[in-house]
Amino acid sequence: MGRIIGIDLGTTNSCVAVMENGSPKVIENAEGARTTPSIVAYAEDGEILVGAPAKRQAVTNPKNTIFAVKRLIGRRFEEKEVQKDIGLMPYKIVKADNGDAWVEVRDKKMAAQQVSAEILRKMKKTAEDYLGEEVTEAVITVPAYFNDSQRQATKDAGRIAGLEVKRIINEPTAAALAFGMDKKEGDRKIAVYDLGGGTFDISIIEIAEMDGEHQFEVLSTNGDTFLGGEDFDQRLIDYIAEEFKKEQGVDLKKDVLALQRLKEAAEKAKIELSSGQQTEVNLPYITADASGPKHLAVKITRAKFESLVEELITRTIEPCKLALKDAGLTTSQIDDVILVGGQTRMPKVMDAVKDFFGKEPRRDVNPDEAVAVGAAIQGGVLQGEVKDVLLLDVTPLSLGIETLGGVMTKLIPKNTTIPTKASQVFSTADDNQSAVTVHVLQGEREMASGNKSLGQFNLSDIPPAPRGMPQIEVTFDIDANGILHVSAKDKATGKENKIRIQASSGLSEEEIQRMVKDAEANAAEDHKAFELAGARNAADAMIHSVKKSLAEYGDKVSADEKATIESALKEAEDAVREGDKETIETKTNALATASHKLAEQMYQAEQAKAQPAGETGNQSTGPGNDDVVDAEFEEVKDK
């Protein structure tokens, strides 16, 4: 059985960890960083860049560089949150045939799951490079307030990336695992305040010792899946663009290249204002008009930034109140407050949390890594490596069906511990009704139209009977991933229809399989490109070496041999420019063979040079001197 890795698939950054010798370890990526920007770029030559390389080229390729795609995953194009993003993103958000929000890059429509899969593939490769073995299983985290469609879409992204997603767990719950695993302080109630790049969650969790077992029980959860650091950045972008417009009369928002530069500068300024009281955004040659180039220089104080985002911070407090109310607790009953997500580094956010809960948040949890660490611990639990840990999570939103009059009848209330199962008997609305449509909903509104539709299915061939007589038993079953399975059964005939809820949107099995094949083809292409680069490097090294030797020792070989070497050199150079891996390797080997005589001459010349030097000192190199001196050496270990 392979290793189960833990992945925090974030809006802005992602992170991967694994259990090693009983402890979770965050793995550094190929660039040497512990977190990877959740950015995917599609280059003109078909190459797909992920992470830091994608971020570096974003300014010159804004329309084909996708960031914050987590805000679109599992969402319908018509949703107001998606419509809001359409006007803000430099890349194109389009409506898919199934009504989902997809992106368009280089005239190709792509699902958010496909883009997310590229990030997951990078995380998978990071783990494989570190472990030295193939990784096929993972625990992936999602915001606690993600609905069923978003959870299912995240699981699909894992499949496209070549991962079997063993468990989907909520980000605050994962952070609680990371925090509480080594704490032996008895029963504690903690609040996990998770303000990430694109989502906000608050979870109230009880950590208890039960018969020697560490039990993590989520008492309640709440949040906003469209509130995060990206929104804080946007407030800063809007302000800087407005100031520039006042001063120069040019609207930077109409220029995608300028906007991308502005986004990078705003993100940097936001980070600087967490430690400093003032910063300056300097962007020379940001744009130009008839009068010539324009330069941007705007000073921003911490107080100004705080006033710009005050409303966003206030928006996080209402879910905190609701979560406490649902848990039946007051702020004084919370023992610890944990901050998760990069945006919680902002002093004003820390102050708001401190003011609400009446206590200093803990500083001993890394806000960028805690979620991945918790996911790795859950992977260890599933693998049997981590023992005596029980995780009891909840469903964040109520689940039910549409009944007569367009009302939502709830079968499973929000904050119910999962996995769980609930059944209720319904009947027909008309005489002799032969079929019923079960319309599955998720949300807290009383009317069906105000809630998220998760899908629907029919139960047909109901025997004719007066209305209200047939007994249709509807059963909801939520698995440990928080994903819903629904069945409807006619109790009179025993006829049953069941489905795993796949939203009226979502990807079909055929689409997922096609995307898996695309991803595999990309991986194969990547490997071929990697091997080609290796062959070119080896050839370049050989060409350089032979050219150098030819310049120094060319007069020591015959004219024919020199001509053969020069011919082999030219063929090798041509192969490097235009050839495939096999051609390059063949021509490199031919060059090595052709230059063999030259190498011999070079070796003899080096020996001749070394001989006089050997004769002037101790004659240890001469024949007949068999004395061997044993040298003592001390190994110096790195401190």
Curated annotation (Swiss-Prot):
Induction: By stress conditions e.g. heat shock.
Protein's name in the database: Chaperone protein DnaK
GO MF, one annotated term: ATP binding
Organism superkingdom: Bacteria
Family statement: Belongs to the heat shock protein 70 family.
Name of encoding gene: dnaK
Sorted UniProt keywords: ATP-binding, Chaperone, Nucleotide-binding, Phosphoprotein, Stress response
Keyword Ribosomal protein included in the entry's annotation: no
UniProt cross-references to CDD domains, sorted A to Z: ASKHA_NBD_HSP70_DnaK-like
NCBIfam families named in the record: PRK00290.1 (NF001413), PRK05183.1 (NF003520), prok_dnaK (TIGR02350)
Function description: Acts as a chaperone.
Protein's UniProt keywords contain ATP-binding: yes
Organism whose genome encodes this protein: Thiobacillus denitrificans (strain ATCC 25259 / T1)
Disulphide bridges, residue numbers: none
InterPro entries, per the entry: ATPase_NBD, Chaperone_DnaK, Heat_shock_70_CS, HSP70_C_sf, HSP70_peptide-bd_sf, Hsp_70_fam
Lineage: Bacteria, Pseudomonadati, Pseudomonadota, Betaproteobacteria, Nitrosomonadales
